[in-house]
Amino acid sequence: MSRVAIIDFGSQFTQLLARRIRELNVYSEIFPHDIAFDYIKDSKAFILSGGPKSVLDFTGMPPIVHDIIELNKKTSVPVLGVCYGLQLLSNYFNSTIVHGCGQEFGKAILNVVKKSEMIKDVWKVGDQPYVWMSHADSVYDTPCGFEVIACSVVNNAIAMISNEERRIYGVQFHPEVYHTPDGVKLLANFVRIAGCDNNWTVESFLDEQENLIKKQVGDKKVIAALSGGVDSSVAAALTYRAIGDQLHCIFIDNGLLRYNEAEKVRQSFVDQFQMPVTIVDRSSVFLDKLQFVTDPEQKRKIIGKTFIEVFEEEANKIGNVEFLMQGTIYPDVIESGGSVGKESVTIKSHHNVGGLPDIMKLQLVEPLKLLFKDEVRLLGKKLGISDEILMRHPFPGPGLAIRIIGEITQEKVNMLQAADEIYINLIKKYNLYDVIWQAFAVLLPVKTVGVMGDSRTYGYTCALRAVTSSDGMTAECFPFGVDLETKIIFYEFLQDVSNTIVNNVQGINRVVYDTTSKPPATIEWE
């Protein structure tokens, strides 16, 4: 399978660049700029990403750029520089880079002045297409051996260059963002120029990964901590398809999960897939250790430590286990700095099993570590996993422990589980679940006076949270950013959910809605 290697110089859009290439059914992979070149020199094409640094600040060209250009000199392997990547290429080929002069942020209009294979069937000479810019430095003059393909209408700054003979291209704008309408078409031209195979599909990944799991594991036993979330569920289904009963899934009920979670996991995996899952109820153990604890970080540590103790105890009952399966996905690998070819590789562990590979001396099986979240969901569909699991909202590792503000008791857990179940079910009834990125209820350590019938009540306050987001890094309170009709429906929904919770959950007599964005707040309360 041919690969487009994306060299990451720190752009916030690097993952998006990889996704756009994969949407063209071409396999792309992100590598840090300090990777050993031998690991990637067999790539079909190279893309130099954008980044926050300035070419004017370093004293020498990054070695990876020199290696790629030298390879191109011998083989004409295609190279594309995006934003900072363009400036790196231009600097390498003796162009002048200037700061401040020609800077642009946001929407921009180009003048197309020359033909290029990069713009074939997309733009023609004389066109003035919209693109999206985000740069303070600019390329002042044409690099040696290159031609200018497009300039900015506003300041005539160089926006696109090409060396057709050597198949080296550079763009000052970001083709990977949706604000550049023709960006994907330009990237499609680049992979066409490179002669990349269009065979990166969920089906091809499934077949290949199944064989890789069989080869890695052989006849040995594999254990997995099943959480009921998207990633661990898809990873477990794929691994079970590959090795069958050699996989031993353990689901630990810590008493802080969503309502009836253990039963839902049993129905999904035991009933649907006939996959053996050991369901271990240790609710009392976790709740006992959390008694009188109010600090959220202390809660997390206690839950993490107790989880490892329980998981290790259950794993030892199986015996002779050599592998641990984890639902690590590609963004986890990238964000933790892990990549092939680096001197030290740190893989982000599952929130509850961090440290287990070292403690139990297990080898890792990570069947999803090359997939983005949307690809994981597509794979899950191919494996027959229900939308009930695949489209679930994110749920924190410590569970309801960080949604019960203050001390945790069984009574509070019961109240919050009931309130949250009502909230989520009504969200689905109003057809809002798929347009909300994450929604949940929070139990506050605040009691207020209320009236029910002719009696005075003194009960807890429940806060509702619902946000829209693309990646969880930033978030807006729902229903900002949606149409007026949805907003009207949402206000009707809030009245409905408030009344339903207060009338059906004993101990809660007031419901409030959290309207804070991230930043300044975080999505979770603790």
From Swiss-Prot:
The keyword Ligase is assigned to this record: yes
Cell membrane in keyword set: no
Protein name per the record: GMP synthase [glutamine-hydrolyzing]
GO molecular function: ATP binding; GMP synthase activity
Gene name of this polypeptide: guaA
Species, as recorded: Ehrlichia chaffeensis (strain ATCC CRL-10679 / Arkansas)
Lineage: Bacteria, Pseudomonadati, Pseudomonadota, Alphaproteobacteria, Rickettsiales
Active site: 83 (nucleophile), 174, 176
InterPro entries hit by this protein: Class_I_gatase-like (IPR029062), GATASE (IPR017926), GMP_synth_C (IPR001674), GMP_synth_GATase (IPR004739), GMP_synthase (IPR022955), GMPS_ATP_PPase_dom (IPR025777), NAD/GMP_synthase (IPR022310), Rossmann-like_a/b/a_fold (IPR014729)
Superkingdom of origin: Bacteria
Signal sequence region: none
Residues binding ATP, per UniProt: 227-233
Domain (Glutamine amidotransferase type-1) ranges: 3-199
Pathway entry: Purine metabolism; GMP biosynthesis; GMP from XMP (L-Gln route): step 1/1
GO CC, alphabetical: cytosol
Keywords: ATP-binding, Glutamine amidotransferase, GMP biosynthesis, Ligase, Nucleotide-binding, Purine biosynthesis
Gene3D superfamilies: 3.30.300.10, 3.40.50.880, HUPs
Catalyses which reaction(s): XMP + L-glutamine + ATP + H2O = GMP + L-glutamate + AMP + diphosphate + 2 H(+)
SUPFAM superfamilies: Adenine nucleotide alpha hydrolases-like, Class I glutamine amidotransferase-like, GMP synthetase C-terminal dimerisation domain
Residue span, GMPS ATP-PPase domain: 200-392
Enzyme Commission number, as recorded: 6.3.5.2
Role of this protein: Catalyzes the synthesis of GMP from XMP.
Self-association state and partner proteins as the record states: Homodimer.
Enzyme class: ligase
